[in-house]
Amino acid sequence: MKPGAPPIATPLLDTLQRGLAELDAQGLRRVRRTADTACDAHMRVDGRDIVGFASNDYLGLAAHPALVAAFAEGAQRYGSGSGGSHLLGGHSRAHARLEDELAGFAGGFSDAPRALYFSTGYMANLAAMTALTGKQATIFSDALNHASLIDGIRLSRANVQIYPHADMHALGALLDASDAPTKLIVSDTVFSMDGDLAPLAELVALAERHGAWLVVDDAHGFGVLGPQGRGALAAAALRSPNLVYVGTLGKAAGVAGAFVVAHETAIEWMIQRARSYIFTTAAPPAVAHAVSASLKVIGGDEGDARRAHLAALIERTRALLRATRWQPVDSHTAVQPLVIGSNDATLAAMRALDARGLWVPAIRPPTVPAGTSRLRISLSAAHSFDDLARLEAALIAASEASA
């Protein structure tokens, strides 16, 4: 632009500003909070001490001394970064070892399991949806699947059939009517906003009956469900050659990243064709080194003790939520939603809890359907029963004030 020339009009900024104003008017603008300390049940956030019910740190491992030490050890050994993509110099011994460990830990459903490590769960789901399908495939997706699965499905160029949430009769009818040469059924195991479990045994049976593959996203089950925390498939004692298992490592595992476990041939194909694996820098090896330490805790006696404590917290929370004037969702997992309804009422409840030093996030559209805004209470083995007593008193007071 020449000196002195008038500025070029930027209608995009005007459009964005109007969009932000609309979000404000609808009570839908999201605001980040800043943690000053490590992720834990008791934290300092935005300069205030709080009890946090917002994280997905289900086993309370994010600040575990063994994991912190392993992270530091990994950085000393491998440096701070990987230096490249997995196929161009960034694949370290820490990554390779972790993949072997994950295949053994979570791959009991397969006779020939292999694991592939990703930097995020979003990237892992994109890889599974895009590399294993294509224009000739049909994907059958639960209506409440996670956004990362939905985005992967959109990128896959496959035909898509959405079945009502957990409705196996409807899914069976769609499969009966399909003549696609490749069929993929896709489902979360634990649904992140309701906390309910997918009917996995029925999904596996339908997949085998129709010659379909079943991809399950166990983001909220890995580390928590099943013997030794091996996940939802292990909890249901399911085995099938047609399974693809996605797990995340930044929730119960307390570190970061994700992985896919499947038959070794499917994993080799993903290495060759999954764009979200190929065209990105590998995660720092220190992260993988810390995850290896996490698996030892998850699968050991301490992991069993943490899961037992978490189970007791879940049952206590289910009871206390029924004492409020709002609508609890029937969840037996660490995700305990409390449906309030309107955006404004949900935000008011969140602020009332915050005033008492409790961080419980408000979940609003488009994450959940309009009219079902809710508080999402996320439990951790790091919580105590005293923490729940504080939560109960605050919830009852807030619900009565809203009546």
UniProtKB/Swiss-Prot annotation:
Residues spanning the signal sequence: none
How would you classify this enzyme at the top EC level?
transferase
Q: What is its EC number?
A: 2.3.1.47
Q: Which domain of life is it from?
A: Bacteria
Among the Pfam families in the record, one is: Aminotran_1_2
Positions binding substrate in this chain are R30, H146, T367
Keywords carried by this UniProt record: Biotin biosynthesis, Pyridoxal phosphate, Transferase
Give the modified residues of type N6-(pyridoxal phosphate)lysine. Answer: K251
Residue spans crossing the bilayer = none
Transferase among keywords: yes
Question: Which catalysed reactions does the entry list for this protein?
Answer: 6-carboxyhexanoyl-[ACP] + L-alanine + H(+) = (8S)-8-amino-7-oxononanoate + holo-[ACP] + CO2
GO annotation (BP), single: biotin biosynthetic process
Q: Does the keyword Transferase apply?
A: yes
Q: Name the InterPro entries on file.
A: Aminotransferase_I/II_large, AON_synthase_class-II, AONS_Archaea/Proteobacteria, AONS_Proteobacteria, PyrdxlP-dep_Trfase, PyrdxlP-dep_Trfase_major, PyrdxlP-dep_Trfase_small
Q: Which SUPFAM superfamilies match?
A: PLP-dependent transferases (SSF53383)
Q: Where does pyridoxal 5'-phosphate bind?
A: G121, Y122, S192, H220, T248
For this UniProt entry, the molecular function terms from Gene Ontology, in alphabetical order, are: 8-amino-7-oxononanoate synthase activity; pyridoxal phosphate binding
Cofactor dependence:
pyridoxal 5'-phosphate
- Identify the metabolic or biological route this protein is part of: Cofactor biosynthesis; biotin biosynthesis
Question: Subunit composition?
Answer: Homodimer.
The record's function comment reads:
Catalyzes the decarboxylative condensation of pimeloyl-[acyl-carrier protein] and L-alanine to produce 8-amino-7-oxononanoate (AON), [acyl-carrier protein], and carbon dioxide.
* PANTHER family (alphabetical): 8-AMINO-7-OXONONANOATE SYNTHASE, CLASS II AMINOTRANSFERASE/8-AMINO-7-OXONONANOATE SYNTHASE
Family classification: Belongs to the class-II pyridoxal-phosphate-dependent aminotransferase family. BioF subfamily.
Entry protein name: 8-amino-7-oxononanoate synthase
Origin species, per record, is: Burkholderia vietnamiensis (strain G4 / LMG 22486)
Gene name of the record: bioF
